[in-house]
């Protein structure tokens, strides 16, 4: 059990009983990102303790998320072209539950990278992605305010949620950057190929001109 009762019937968390996992030793860059965010095992514990409230309200959270996306027609078009709202709702529910599972490991990170590549592939602009995550953060903060009375635990839970959402966004934005870099490399390669073709064509013309003379 996560909770014990004090004499005044106030629920407090028995933190020692909460099992979480933060392991990313195979990826030094990701490990550095997590260190810079200050995302710790204690944060994962706060997320896991709060998961029952998230699970209880997950339908409303996801509905609000997609209602907000529905305000932008280009996003609706992207969704309808590549999937459906109902399918994506199931995916988002699973995604959110994993965020509050208390586990961040290589598998967690690889899943995020895969999702990021999908976002890039379907043409989801970064401004919409960031805006959508901001709406999630507001929803989570309101949920914390409604369910946690203790000031310190409330602050730590909100901080943990902010960190995990920031980490998720970093993974996606990094994938966008990689795509842009690859596109720039391809453009430079095309420029070189065109330049070489022009030089070769000029050389051939010069050779033909000399033969004619």
Regions found by a protein language model. Give the residues of each.
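Preference for long, well-ordered alpha-helical segments
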Residues: 148-176
């Amino acid at each position: 059990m996560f909770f014990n009762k004090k004499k005044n019937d106030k629920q407090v968390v028995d933190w020692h009983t909460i099992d979480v996992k933060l392991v990313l030793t195979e990826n030094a860059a990701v490990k550095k990102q997590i260190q810079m965010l200050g995302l710790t095992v204690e944060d994962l514990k706060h997320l896991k303790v709060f998961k029952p409230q998230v699970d209880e309200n997950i339908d409303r959270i996801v509905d609000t998320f997609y209602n907000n996306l529905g305000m932008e027609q280009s996003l609706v078009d992207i969704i309808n072209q590549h999937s459906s709202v109902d399918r994506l709702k199931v995916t988002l529910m699973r995604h959110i539950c994993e965020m509050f599972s208390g586990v961040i490991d290589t598998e967690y990170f690889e899943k995020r990278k895969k999702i990021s590549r999908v976002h890039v592939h379907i043409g989801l602009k970064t401004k919409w992605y960031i805006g959508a995550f901001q709406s999630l953060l507001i929803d989570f903060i309101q949920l914390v305010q409604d369910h946690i009375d203790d000031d310190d635990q409330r602050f730590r839970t909100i901080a943990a949620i902010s960190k995990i959402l920031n980490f998720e966004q970093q993974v996606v934005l990094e994938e966008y950057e990689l795509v842009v870099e690859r596109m720039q490399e391809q453009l430079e390669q095309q420029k070189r190929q065109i330049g070489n073709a022009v030089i070769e064509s000029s050389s051939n013309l010069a050779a033909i001109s000399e033969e004619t003379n």
